[in-house]
A protein has these predicted regions:
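Ligand-binding cleft/hinge of the Venus flytrap
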Residues: 1-13, 168-177
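Solvent-exposed, polar/charged alpha-helical surfaces in well-ordered, non-transmembrane soluble domains
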Residues: 15, 25, 29, 33, ...
Length: 306
């Protein structure tokens, strides 16, 4: 019997509900066979799902090239900018189902209940320009150790989209500068270990935020930011991010974040390539389960089982 002195306004739907967390080795098969009720997957994994289910789509991940600024060549901002100007996003997006990334913060992030990108603009990256790239390169060349132009290691997880884009980008770098890279496809564990230890020159990184805020993405490029794998930081962007976090007015905060984001992109230690969608799928026998694409948590508060 319900306790009248301790009741909720929301009715309790199921008579009983148990939650089990399964290992991720066979999670796609487990979802298809209804062993698990919900699953978060990327686009490639989505194609492997079968049966009836509902889908929530989130644009909360930016895939890009993280340049290790401890590497001799990449300690020079001019050379980094030369490389960034040879990324032709229109060409990269041809034949791809992913939207090209012209900024760091993805479209899922909101401020004032509106997409953050409405305040900051969608396009912050430099235009593809061989001429501009050569200007940066020729200016930086006297400072560069050209013996390092061969063998720079690009580490990445297995990813067909990123591999195809890398092939195009590396051809541009080879043609214009004679800069040759070696791609290493790694397991998730090995990639994470190499990224954390700095044992790489370039990493294909999936940038995500722990909360719904531009600052959660941009802090990865601050002096004391968690996940600052590039080693890049500047007093300008650090100050703008701190000011944005302190701003009482969210519209002012958005403008400050946008300036910080532009400053970081100008530093060219992270070169955005494309936005990667995540899909939260719910088995047909369940409803009202919600997913947070930022902190990767699932809300079962009002879950219903049929």
């Amino acid at each position: 019997r319900r306790n009248a002195k301790n009741s909720e306004t929301s009715p309790v739907i199921p008579s009983g509900l148990n939650f089990f967390i399964e290992g991720d080795e066979d999670f796609v098969d487990d979802f298809n066979s209804s062993v698990i009720s919900c699953i978060a997957v990327d686009e490639e994994q989505l194609e492997l799902l079968s049966g009836k289910f509902t889908v929530q789509e989130y644009d909360a991940i930016t895939v890009g090239l993280t340049l290790n600024t401890d590497f001799g060549l990449f300690s020079d901002q001019g050379f980094r900018k030369a490389l960034a100007c040879l990324v032709d996003r229109e060409k990269l997006s041809e034949g791809s189902s992913h939207a090209a990334a012209y900024a760091i913060v993805p479209g899922e992030v909101t401020l004032l209940d509106k997409p953050y990108r409405e305040f900051s603009g969608d396009k912050l990256t430099p235009d593809y320009s061989v001429e501009k790239s050569q200007e940066y390169y020729q200016s930086a060349l006297p400072r560069l150790d050209t013996s390092l132009f061969s063998g720079a290691r690009i580490i990445m997880r297995e990813n067909e989209t990123a591999s195809a884009m890398l092939s195009v980008i590396m051809q541009e770098w080879q043609r214009e500068f004679g800069f040759y890279c070696v791609v290493e496809e790694l397991s998730e564990a090995d990639f994470s270990a190499r990224l954390s230890s700095g044992d790489y020159e370039i990493a294909v990184q999936e940038l995500s935020g722990s909360v719904n805020s531009p600052g959660a993405y941009l802090q990865a490029f601050t002096t004391d930011g968690a996940g600052n794998y590039s080693g890049y930081h500047s007093a300008d962007s650090d100050g703008l991010i701190k000011a944005a976090q302190r701003a009482a007015d969210l519209a002012d905060s958005a403008k400050l974040y946008a300036k910080a984001e532009q400053s970081i992109i100008n530093g060219a230690a992270f070169i955005p390539l494309y936005y990667k969608n995540e899909y939260f799928c719910i088995n047909k026998d369940f409803a009202d389960i919600y997913y947070d694409p930022f902190n990767k948590t699932v809300d079962f508060t009002n879950a219903k089982a049929f």
